[in-house]
Amino acid sequence: MFDEQAIKQSVQNILVAIGEDPDREGLKETPRRVAQMYTELFSGMNQDPAEVLRVGYELGHREMVIIKDIPFYSMCEHHLLPFSGVVHIGYIPNIDGRVVGISKLARVVEIYAKRPQIQERMATQIADAIMDGLKCDGVAVVIEAEHMCMVMRGIKKPGSRVITSALRGSFHKSPAARAEFLSLIQHKG
């Protein structure tokens, strides 16, 4: 659970530390607003992706399943600034052909995105959760994102995108499976 009172007090302390008056008209409600925002932005902290993946269907489908361009936003754990982009997920069902509803994969993305996060770990967590939850033959995850910590501060390079991947099972072992996945996520239309 979140300690909203501690968040409010911390925001008030930051405002004072930067020389602002937390009681002035535009800032009076800021600590409360930030506490509510953090409760929403970090709601994945209290969610278990295994629960989302528990319900599936054994359809005998043995071919690659891909959902691409899943939009997300998250908060960089280094600066607490947002990063956002898209996630592409592919998996190859196991011998039973167990699949899940495609919205379940988007929910797994949301759970891991709504935590203080780094993009590399997020890709790994999504891939591991799907591999463990579906017991599939393979999982591929590619994340493309723009990080506000590179846009607003430091190097200040808007438009630069970070791409990370996590490959498990057949996607890690088979260059053909990996190439097919990468080709399909590049396909426009």
Swiss-Prot record:
Gene3D superfamilies: 1.10.286.10, 3.30.1130.10. Zn(2+) binds at C76, H79, C149. InterPro entries: GTP-CH-I_C/QueF (IPR043133), GTP-CH-I_N (IPR043134), GTP_CycHdrlase_I (IPR001474), GTP_CycHdrlase_I_CS (IPR018234), GTP_CycHdrlase_I_dom (IPR020602). One of its GO terms (biological process) is tetrahydrofolate biosynthetic process. GO terms for cellular component: cytoplasm. Its EC number is 3.5.4.16. Pathway: Cofactor biosynthesis; 7,8-dihydroneopterin triphosphate biosynthesis; 7,8-dihydroneopterin triphosphate from GTP: step 1/1. The keyword Metal-binding applies. Pfam families: GTP_cyclohydroI. It catalyses: GTP + H2O = 7,8-dihydroneopterin 3'-triphosphate + formate + H(+). Keywords: GTP-binding, Hydrolase, Metal-binding, Nucleotide-binding, One-carbon metabolism, Zinc. SUPFAM superfamilies: Tetrahydrobiopterin biosynthesis enzymes-like. GO terms for molecular function: GTP binding; GTP cyclohydrolase I activity; zinc ion binding. Belongs to the GTP cyclohydrolase I family. Homomer. HAMAP family: FolE. This is GTP cyclohydrolase 1.
